[in-house]
Amino acid sequence: MSIPLLVIVSGPPASGKTTLARQLAHELNLPLITKDDIKESLFDSLGWQDRAWSKKLGAATYHLLYYFLEAALAGGVSLIVESNFGPMSTSELKRLQEIYPFRPFQVMCRADGKT
């Protein structure tokens, strides 16, 4: 089995991450996991309440994102993952790479604020 490729698309909000990730997934014919798609699905299923609820769903979103990511990597599947990953994400991605070796390729999106 070859070592899977993990394309990590990251950057601040409104920097074009999702647009780029969707285009890459289409062009490379790779599955795509996006944080916002997971969170929207949770909101659609569980509803909206207040800021505290949103934070709980945000934590659950990352838990599910890493769960899906781990399942794909365990199966040797190359894929794209998109989120505004923070510093805490590095340790989780390193942990996954130790268990399920993958070839990382990170794309960091930025915008000048005028877009």
Region locations from a protein language model:
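The conserved Walker
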Residues: 12-13
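Conserved substrate/cofactor phosphate-moiety recognition/catalytic segment
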Residues: 19-74
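Glycine-rich phosphate-binding loop used to anchor ATP phosphates in small-molecule kinases
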Residues: 56-103
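Hydrophobic "anchor" residues on beta-strands that sit immediately upstream
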Residues: 6, 32, 78
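Conserved phosphate-donor/acceptor-positioning beta-strand/loop module used by diverse small-molecule
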Residues: 99-115
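Phosphate-binding P-loop
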Residues: 1-4, 73
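Hydrophobic anchor at the beta1->P-loop junction of P-loop NTPases
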Residues: 9
